[in-house]
């Protein structure tokens, strides 16, 4: 058996077409969704991510603002910029690209963003809303993963066992909560898990999100399982790869996401969805 690919690029195109149509309808009412992206420092990877996000905004008809600052920017200065964007009626979503320089407290900056404009879904208000099942912005990467599951007919995961490898605030924890909300039985594995393979072999859905190559290999996967690879790493040849041993696991799994072309484009797409919904709530 060879797994079917869940094509993140194709699904993203479909969803972005829907976003563009809803954006056009909003513009007819005199509202243009606006996203502000703030980049501090010259991290090369961050510059690529930011460029992709701004282009995606332009493609669907959003108003986007990119603010670039030198790494010497103080925390106080950044907090002041965030507050100014909170008060800007043309901006519906604020994204501060992480990581920030070491002298700036990521958490303090995220908490300074208005929960009404927290389109990354990282604010404690957003995390709390997810926890208790209220309406709030969902973290973009796990939100994209859920859309990928929906695309293969797995919107309701009742009776399914899902294993999340990773417990970060950005992916692992919100991923577990979204799977739980979809009625899955959820196990979260991490560096303190004694026998990872024993857990993953029972799973109908595995989400790998630790940033470590080959954390999931073919012998660890239940035949026919759905494998979602959130990882972004480089192999020995310098090529982009995920957390999953793709070539091996695709021989066992029922569905698998590729890297690149899987979760990555979906993350940006869900950022667009969140920004659009922020504008629609006006």
From Swiss-Prot:
Signal peptide: none annotated. GO terms for biological process: L-histidine biosynthetic process; methionine biosynthetic process; purine nucleotide biosynthetic process; tetrahydrofolate interconversion. Its EC number is 1.5.1.5, 3.5.4.9. It catalyses: (6R)-5,10-methylene-5,6,7,8-tetrahydrofolate + NADP(+) = (6R)-5,10-methenyltetrahydrofolate + NADPH; (6R)-5,10-methenyltetrahydrofolate + H2O = (6R)-10-formyltetrahydrofolate + H(+). SUPFAM superfamilies: Aminoacid dehydrogenase-like, N-terminal domain, NAD(P)-binding Rossmann-fold domains. The keyword Cytoplasm does not apply. GO terms for molecular function: methenyltetrahydrofolate cyclohydrolase activity; methylenetetrahydrofolate dehydrogenase (NADP+) activity. NADP(+) binds at residues 166-168, 191. GO terms for cellular component: cytosol. Transmembrane segments: none annotated. Keywords: Amino-acid biosynthesis, Histidine biosynthesis, Hydrolase, Methionine biosynthesis, Multifunctional enzyme, NADP, One-carbon metabolism, Oxidoreductase, Purine biosynthesis. Pathway: One-carbon metabolism; tetrahydrofolate interconversion. Belongs to the tetrahydrofolate dehydrogenase/cyclohydrolase family. NCBIfam families: PRK10792.1, PRK14186.1, PRK14189.1. Homodimer. Catalyzes the oxidation of 5,10-methylenetetrahydrofolate to 5,10-methenyltetrahydrofolate and then the hydrolysis of 5,10-methenyltetrahydrofolate to 10-formyltetrahydrofolate. This is Bifunctional protein FolD. It comes from Acidovorax sp. (strain JS42).
């Amino acid at each position: 058996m060879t797994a079917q690919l869940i094509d993140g690029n194709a699904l993203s195109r479909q969803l972005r077409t829907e976003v563009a149509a809803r954006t056009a309808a909003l513009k007819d009412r005199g509202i243009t969704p606006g996203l502000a992206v703030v980049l501090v420092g010259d991290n090369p990877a961050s510059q690529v991510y930011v460029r992709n996000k701004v282009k995606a905004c332009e493609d669907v008809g959003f108003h986007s603002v990119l603010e670039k600052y030198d790494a010497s920017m103080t925390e106080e200065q950044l907090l002041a910029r965030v507050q100014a964007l909170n008060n800007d009626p043309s901006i519906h979503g604020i994204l501060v690209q992480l990581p920030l320089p070491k002298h700036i407290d990521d958490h303090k900056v995220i908490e300074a963003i208005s929960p009404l404009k927290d389109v990354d879904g990282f604010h404690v208000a957003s995390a709390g809303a997810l926890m208790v099942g209220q309406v709030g912005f969902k973290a973009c990467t796990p939100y994209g993963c859920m859309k990928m599951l929906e695309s293969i007919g797995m919107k309701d995961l009742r009776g399914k066992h899902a294993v999340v490898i990773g417990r970060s605030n950005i992916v692992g924890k919100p991923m577990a909560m979204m799977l739980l909300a979809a009625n899955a039985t959820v196990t979260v594995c991490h560096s303190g898990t004694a026998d990872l393979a024993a857990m993953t072999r029972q799973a109908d859905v595995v989400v790998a999100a630790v940033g470590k190559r080959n954390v999931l290999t073919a012998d660890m996967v239940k035949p026919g399982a759905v494998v979602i690879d959130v990882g972004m790493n480089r192999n020995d040849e310098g090529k982009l790869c995920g957390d999953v041993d793709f070539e091996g696991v695709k021989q066992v799994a029922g569905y698998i996401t590729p890297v690149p072309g899987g979760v990555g484009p979906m993350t940006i797409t869900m950022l667009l969805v969140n920004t659009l919904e922020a504008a629609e709530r006006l």
